[in-house]
């Protein structure tokens, strides 16, 4: 059963925001010192009452380093499976807008690596939302948080099983938020997911979002990939 937004909406009184980690690098470094990826844990008495999620989710972080392979830059930060643990994690890491240029966050179902080559992603694609640079301060964190709450709260009707994860790319030339799905050929499913995504993020009709196939992105020769679906769809005459 989907979790309503009211159940997953941020409650400041039940999440300790004192002494948050100043940088995501610190969160990653603290996990590097443990044998296994840590599980986020809420610290308040109220958190003893847990609200389980339908899936376990893993947060990944990437800080680009030209001297390292891409996979070596990718770190799994934490795994969680309750609403409370999500907020404990979210409140103690940097917001997307606070990340350095070239950094990414990935939130994927546990067991799915945030890369095109993963068997769960190889036939899939992504809904891509480009953040208006002039409205970055208002939109980036809003888009990212709304997307996170939507996927962990199973807000995509009966299509939750088709969703793999979410990504935010922080770039000086323009930030991007994306939602990855499992099968790029399921046009009806992906269209409905995109419609829900656009509504959740409150993106106006004047700003289209596009669905791109991973394989097309991996072999592109220019900066743009021809989308498989665009919302709103252009009228045919």
What residue ranges belong to the model's regions?
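Intrinsically disordered, low-complexity, Lys/Arg-biased terminal tails
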Residues: 5, 136, 140, 144-237
């Amino acid at each position: 059963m989907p979790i309503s937004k009211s159940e997953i909406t941020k409650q400041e009184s039940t999440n300790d925001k004192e002494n948050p980690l100043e940088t995501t690098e610190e969160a990653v470094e603290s996990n590097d010192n443990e044998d296994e990826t840590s599980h986020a844990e809420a610290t308040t008495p109220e958190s003893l009452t847990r609200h389980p999620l339908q899936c376990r989710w893993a947060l990944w972080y990437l800080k680009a380093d030209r001297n390292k392979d891409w996979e070596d830059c990718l770190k799994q930060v934490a795994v969680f499976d309750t609403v409370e643990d999500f907020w404990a994690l979210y409140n103690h890491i940097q917001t997307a807008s606070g990340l350095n240029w070239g950094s990414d966050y990935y939130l994927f179902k546990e067991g799915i690596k945030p890369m095109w080559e993963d068997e769960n992603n190889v036939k899939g694609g992504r809904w891509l939302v480009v953040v208006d640079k002039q409205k970055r301060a208002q939109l980036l964190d809003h888009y990212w948080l709304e997307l996170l709450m939507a996927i962990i709260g199973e807000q995509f009707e009966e299509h939750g099983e088709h969703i793999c994860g979410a990504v935010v790319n922080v770039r000086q030339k323009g930030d991007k938020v994306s939602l990855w799905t499992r099968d790029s050929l399921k046009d009806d499913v992906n269209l409905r997911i995109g419609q829900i995504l656009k509504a959740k993020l409150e993106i106006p009709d004047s700003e289209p979002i596009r669905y791109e196939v991973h394989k097309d992105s991996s072999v592109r020769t220019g900066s743009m990939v021809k989308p498989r679906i665009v919302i709103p769809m252009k009228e045919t005459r």
